[in-house]
């Protein structure tokens, strides 16, 4: 993944055609109407995500954007799809990272939600990034347990990604978690296994991630 390039012009034309500026969240993020995670973003089917160099992007830098999909955070995905994502990609390139590869994660609450983790792909192209962003299920869940499962983003980044920037250049990738709650401090082994569909060695917490 990540072999195409970002075109602000083509993105602008496509956004106008798709009606991003005027449509509602449920019309843009269509999984909200389905009320379920898109099968391509099931974490049990995303046991490894790769960020690789290519002729088009010889110095790839992986960037994970973890979006809180609970009820209070609806405005962030809407801002990204309407204007924030093109500006963000442009700013990243202007700051000296010409080959960004962005992966969207949806993060909720593993104690309450049906889809506490959703996983896209590392992409560079405007069309592909829009696809994964708008495919995210805005579950609008969460509970009164004092936090959300932002640790799931950290767990996935640490255990289920491979990247040429690290293997070839010793450079770490970037993880950005966007939320408005405290993070739950632990991920029980049983919860991780249920979400990822595989055996894991143990629980995870703030201290060992």
Predicted regions and their residues:
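Acidic, low-complexity intrinsically disordered regions
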Residues: 1-209
């Amino acid at each position: 993944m990540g072999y195409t390039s970002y075109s602000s012009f083509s993105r602008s034309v496509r956004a106008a055609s798709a009606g991003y500026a005027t449509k509602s969240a449920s019309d843009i993020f269509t999984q909200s109407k389905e009320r379920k995670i898109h099968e391509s973003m099931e974490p049990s089917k995303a046991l490894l995500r790769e960020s690789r160099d290519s002729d088009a992007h010889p110095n790839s830098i992986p960037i994970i954007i973890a979006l809180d999909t609970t009820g209070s955070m609806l405005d962030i995905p809407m801002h990204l799809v309407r204007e924030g994502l093109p500006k963000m990609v442009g700013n990243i390139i202007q700051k000296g990272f010409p080959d960004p590869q962005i992966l969207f994660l949806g993060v909720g609450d593993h104690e309450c939600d049906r889809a506490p983790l959703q996983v896209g792909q590392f992409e560079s192209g405007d069309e592909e990034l829009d696809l994964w962003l708008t495919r995210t299920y805005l579950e609008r869940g969460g509970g009164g347990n004092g936090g959300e499962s932002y640790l799931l983003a950290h767990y996935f980044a640490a255990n289920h990604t491979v990247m040429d920037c690290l293997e070839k250049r010793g450079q770490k990738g970037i993880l950005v978690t966007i939320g408005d709650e405290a993070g739950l401090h632990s991920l029980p082994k049983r919860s991780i296994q249920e979400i990822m569909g595989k055996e894991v060695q143990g629980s995870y917490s703030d201290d060992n991630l």
